[in-house]
Curated annotation (Swiss-Prot):
Involved in DNA repair and RecF pathway recombination. The keyword DNA damage applies. The keyword Magnesium does not apply. Disulfide bonds: none annotated. This is DNA repair protein RecO. GO terms for cellular component: bacterial nucleoid. GO terms for biological process: DNA recombination; double-strand break repair. The lineage of its organism: Bacteria, Bacillati, Bacillota, Clostridia, Eubacteriales. Belongs to the RecO family. Keywords: DNA damage, DNA recombination, DNA repair. NCBIfam families: reco (TIGR00613).
Length: 253
């Protein structure tokens, strides 16, 4: 079996056999990889702390036929502060599940790794609003993976999506906004106000470290949530449990 080294973030963990864990890492070098951590469910095991969700690690793995094996691991950043704050933990958990749902295994692409790592650090800062950061994360991740929504040109014909009555039609399945002539083609299309559209553009193209400066509240936040939730559902083809939990938390605040 070949050995290889990675910098990675734990994005999913599940129990395996009597005392092991299977961890999914989003890595800088290899993309998304899955490995077994022997004995990691035992409290004093050398892998126990490093295999918690969100952990940023440097790891050495054995490459196996069907499943790789964790050989050595060093914690770079535990992101303990995220696990100690229920709301911020919910945002970060959803981000990890979204990466896991959208990214195929072994697709070597550094950008999603760097995006998630930066976002985890930002969610860990208590003075930052986690909501606009999440929307920026979703939009940027989609764009990196080839799912960039069309927010200016009509996704049906390519012409400029002229606003009507202060908004445009957004077709989640087709992949973006529609011009008046193509509106009938967009099954399940949603209305987006001009404010929501411009906010999405700003979050998509702006620096994610400044996303917290975008104010999202009330109907504007609800509009963007409906649009992006439908857009992501059309690509994952399943509802993410962590998103449902996050929605429950937000509705109770």
């Amino acid at each position: 079996m070949a050995l290889y080294n990675v910098d990675g973030i734990v994005i999913r963990v599940r129990n395996f056999q009597d005392a092991d864990k299977i961890v999914v890492l989003l890595t800088r070098e290899e993309g998304k990889v899955e490995a077994v951590a022997r004995g990691a469910r035992r409290p004093r095991n050398r892998f126990a702390a490093a295999t918690q969700l969100f952990s940023h690690v440097r790891a050495q793995l054995f490459s196996g036929r069907s499943l790789d094996t964790l050989s050595q691991v060093e914690i770079v950043e535990s992101f303990r502060q995220l696990r100690e704050d229920l709301v911020r933990m919910a945002y970060a958990t959803y981000a990890c599940e979204l990466v896991d749902a959208l990214l195929p295994e072994r697709q070597r692409q550094e950008a999603p790794y760097l995006l998630l790592l930066t976002s985890l650090h930002l969610w860990g800062e208590p003075d930052r609003d986690p909501e606009p950061l999440l929307r920026a994360f979703e939009l940027k991740l989609l764009s990196m993976l080839g799912f960039r929504p069309s927010l200016a040109a009509c996704v049906g014909c390519g012409s400029e999506a002229v606003q009507q009555n202060g908004g445009v039609r957004f077709a989640p399945v087709l992949g973006g906004v529609l011009c008046p002539q193509c509106t009938d083609e967009g099954e399940g299309a949603l209305r987006l106000s001009l404010g929501a559209l411009e906010t999405m553009k700003r979050l998509l193209d702006g620096d994610i470290r400044r996303a917290h400066m975008v104010r999202l509240s009330g109907e504007l936040a609800a509009e963007i949530d409906r649009a992006l939730s439908a857009y992501i559902l059309a690509r994952t083809e399943r509802r993410l449990k962590s998103k449902e939990f996050l929605d429950t938390l937000r509705s109770a605040r």
